[in-house]
Amino acid sequence: MPNPFRFFASGKDKPTLDDREKIDKLYKRSRLSIILVITIGYGFAYPLRLVLSVIKKPLIDGGIFSADELGMIGSALFYVYAFGKLTNGFLADHANIKRFFATGVLVSALINLAMGWSTLLWVWVILWGLNGWFQGFGAPTGAVALSNWFSNRERGRYYGIWSVAHSVGEGLTFLVVAP
């Protein structure tokens, strides 16, 4: 019986390189690529979590949900997101983080689209909670990438660069959703 979790397996080791110059060149290029990908990727994933905060007023004004109901929906995301970050961090340590992160973003995007098909409170609470779970794939994969590619002495600097993604994502949310 096929194991669906094999998709997330970290894969076989690459062959060992002996040429020091080639190793240094490849390592430097890979590190730059890693920091750019995790920063841009997380920045683009962030709006999938913030979209509800932008559309709350129209939902209330349209009589679709009350402020209390939106509070329940929003709480579902944050409670499940917190738990997801905790548990998904353990999973990310042993997973192919490219696939793990991409799956989280893809499922989160699909959930955001699915929310437009219903105005039932319980459906929104469940979907927004699931969105929180899959959003919880993001930060752990970024942390794993940082710890795999940057030394203890460098992590603060590169974590600072990566943390720009939160602001980029928040700005993107208002650019894309608000108009």
Model region roles, listed by residue range:
Residues 2-47:
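Cytosolic juxtamembrane N-terminal segment immediately preceding the first transmembrane helix
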Residues 33-61, 65-67:
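Extracytoplasmic
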Residues 50, 78-86, 136, 170-171:
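Residue-level signature of mid-helix packing/kink "hotspots" within the transmembrane helices
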Residues 56, 169, 173-178:
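Small-residue (Gly/Pro/Ala) motifs that create kinks and tight helix-helix packing interfaces
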Residues 58, 89-90, 179:
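Membrane-interface helix termini in secondary transporters
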Residues 83-119:
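Conserved MFS/SLC helix-loop-helix module at the cytosolic interface between two early adjacent transmembrane helices
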Residues 120-128:
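Short hydrophobic/alpha-helical segments at membrane-entry points of transmembrane helices
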Residues 127-166:
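Cytoplasmic helix-loop-helix junction between adjacent transmembrane helices
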